[in-house]
C-alpha cells in the first residue's frame, strides 16, 4: 500500500470527525433500543496544505493521480495522532498483541505500525510485526507486563475523486481543503 508523501506543510486548521452507524428504535411506550452496525468508528480527516513548493506541488498531484482519486486506499501518517509511547498491550503469557491507538479509555486497533520497540517489565525484548499484530520472538515471564512504543499509520482514501491546488504566487502553491476517510 502506498504511503502519503512526506510533506509537512499542513495548515493548523484541520479537523477529525468520528462517525458511528447507530440504529435507534423507539417503542410506543418510549423505550429506546440502540444498536451499532460498526465495530469501530469511521474517521473523516479534513485538512489542507498551507504552502507547497513547486516540487511538493508536483509530488502531491502525482501521488493523487497515481491513486486515481478515491479509487485506491493509502497510508496516512497523521501530523498529530501517529504514535503511541508506553502503551500497555498485555502480559507475557499471551505472546501476541494487537497494536492499538488510545483515545482516553477507548482502544482502537491499528494495522500499519513501524519503529516498534517492545518492553517486558521495562526491558527491551525482540519482536516482529505482522499487520498490526506484535509477536514476541522469545518467551518472557508469564506475568511480565508488555508495553510498546511505535508509530502507526491510518488506512484512508480520498472522500471525493478530486484534489485542488491553487497557485498563489510564482513558486508558491496551497491546496484547497480535502477530506480523507478511514477504510478497513
PLM regions and their residue ranges:
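Polar/acidic, low-complexity leader/linker segments enriched in S/T/G and N/D
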Residues: 1-22
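Short, solvent-exposed beta-alpha or beta-beta edge segments that form flexible loop/patches at the rim
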Residues: 23-33
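Oligomerization/assembly interface segments of phage tail-like spikes and tubes
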Residues: 33-54, 165-184
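Exposed beta-strand and adjacent loop surfaces of beta-rich binding modules
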Residues: 44, 113-117, 145
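Short, hydrophobic/aromatic-enriched beta-strand segments in well-ordered soluble domains
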Residues: 49, 145-152
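Short, conserved charged micro-motifs
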Residues: 54-60
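Extended beta-strand solenoid/passenger and fiber regions
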Residues: 61-128, 150-184
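A surface-exposed beta-strand-loop module
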Residues: 123-144
Amino acid at each position: 500500500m502506498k504511503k502519503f508523501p512526506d510533506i509537512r506543510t499542513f495548515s493548523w486548521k484541520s479537523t477529525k470527525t468520528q462517525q458511528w452507524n447507530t440504529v435507534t428504535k423507539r417503542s410506543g411506550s418510549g423505550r429506546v433500543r440502540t444498536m451499532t452496525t460498526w465495530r469501530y468508528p469511521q474517521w473523516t480527516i479534513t485538512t489542507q496544505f498551507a504552502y507547497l513548493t513547486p516540487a511538493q506541488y508536483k509530488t502531491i498531484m502525482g501521488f493523487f493521480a497515481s491513486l486515481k482519486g478515491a479509487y485506491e486506499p493509502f497510508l496516512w501518517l497523521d501530523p498529530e495522532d501517529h504514535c503511541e509511547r508506553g502503551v500497555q498491550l498485555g502480559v507475557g503469557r499471551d505472546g501476541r498483541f494487537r497494536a492499538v491507538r488510545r483515545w482516553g479509555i477507548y482502544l482502537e486497533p491499528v494495522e500499519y505500525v513501524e519503529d516498534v520497540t517492545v518492553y517486558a517489565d521495562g526491558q527491551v525484548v525482540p519482536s516482529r510485526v505482522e499487520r498490526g499484530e506484535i509477536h514476541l520472538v522469545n518467551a518472557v515471564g508469564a506475568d511480565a507486563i508488555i508495553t510498546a512504543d511505535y508509530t502507526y499509520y491510518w488506512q484512508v482514501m480520498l472522500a471525493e475523486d478530486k484534489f485542488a491546488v491553487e497557485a498563489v504566487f510564482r513558486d508558491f502553491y496551497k491546496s484547497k481543503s480535502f477530506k480523507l476517510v478511514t477504510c478497513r
